[in-house]
Amino acid sequence: MGFARGQKIDVKDLVVEDGYVYANVTSVGADTAGLLPDLMKGIVTGLNFPKSMHWGSLDFHFVRPIRWFVALFDKDVIPFELANVKSGNVSRGHRFLGTGDFTIESPAAYEETCKEHFLIVDPEVRKQMILEGLQKLADEKGGTIIMDDDLLEEVVYLVEYPTALCGEFDEDYLKLPEAAIITPMKDHQRYFPMRDKDGKLMNLFLTVRNGNDYHLETVQHGNERVLRARLDDAKFFFEEDKKHKLADYTEKLKKIVFQDGLGTLYDKAQRLEKITVFLNHKLDLGLDDAKLQRASLLAKADLATQMVMEFTELQGVMGKEYASSTAKMPAWPKPSTNSTSAFVRRRPAADRHGQSPGIADKFDTITGMFSRGFIPTGSQDPLPCAARPSVPSTSSWMPAGTSTAMKSFLRPQSPRRRRGRRSQVMGQLDDLL
């Protein structure tokens, strides 16, 4: 009886077969046009972003204020309203090149109509336009683009109608370390550097404007002026930092807090000295304790330099630069990468003097943060260094006889397997330390 009522049919219409009761129910299809309005609103509200905003007096959040909707089913507008905005078939062209509002007659005409108003809607088409434009300029200048896929992807979504252009800067800036030139270009200005046929950095850069090729010279000069200011800053910081030895900056680490309850960066450097020596003896690496301690003490020193304070992306890179100019270090700790394992395996033992502080740094950060209760419990890891392959991959160069606790802690594991293993990880840390 209850089953029949649930299916909205009479009991006499039920079908009994092989001990089971069936109900034959015919579902009538709904009108597509009637379903689409709610589907359209669901698509918009279903988009999630790490950060969103609300505007006006609306109780509605989105990544940016919504100005208009274009929603078409064939040539008919799909009617709906969201965030006080009604759907229609009218869009707007490029802010500077477009001629204002324009009508989209049908979905099939969408892409071509937008193009007529200087909007390239397909990101793959924009990417191809950018690549072809950059390559053409590089060929004309006899250079090779230092391509960065992440930067390219970012630029693709920064422009609606891309046009590549080339700029230059004073050759005197080439006296700076390469990283001090490339970092402001890529990370701050979204420029693409170039190398000459000998692999040397050129005093040229490539960039992409959001517009056509009109008045490119004016745009070029504007970009050159902005980059010049960035490089002036880098030059000043570099020259000021070079007035002191890298070791002199370790004292300044006493004024930089690492984490509440875990002391300053100077305290962290002191711990690294002890951990590297411990690992050296525990793993029987056969490294020089004095060199390990020296590298550990200097590993964080560049965090107190003006260059790194201004361009944080240069952490470790400038430390190597300053260390090389003031003292002969056997191997400076390189910035963490996903290829730490390969780096260690393919280098002689001398390089491990520089690698060991990096490994010790990860140990110290993970154990310290865990001890303070900062333990990842989901997919959002508050400790990016804990999830990087650079830590677990180091187990590949551990000698025979390494403790099971240490190998277990360093064994590569997927993020999914890490989740929900708090007690197990804490147990491994306890066994290890």
Q: Over which residues does each language-model region extend?
A:
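Amphipathic alpha-helical "coupling" segments that flank catalytic cores
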Residues: M1-L433
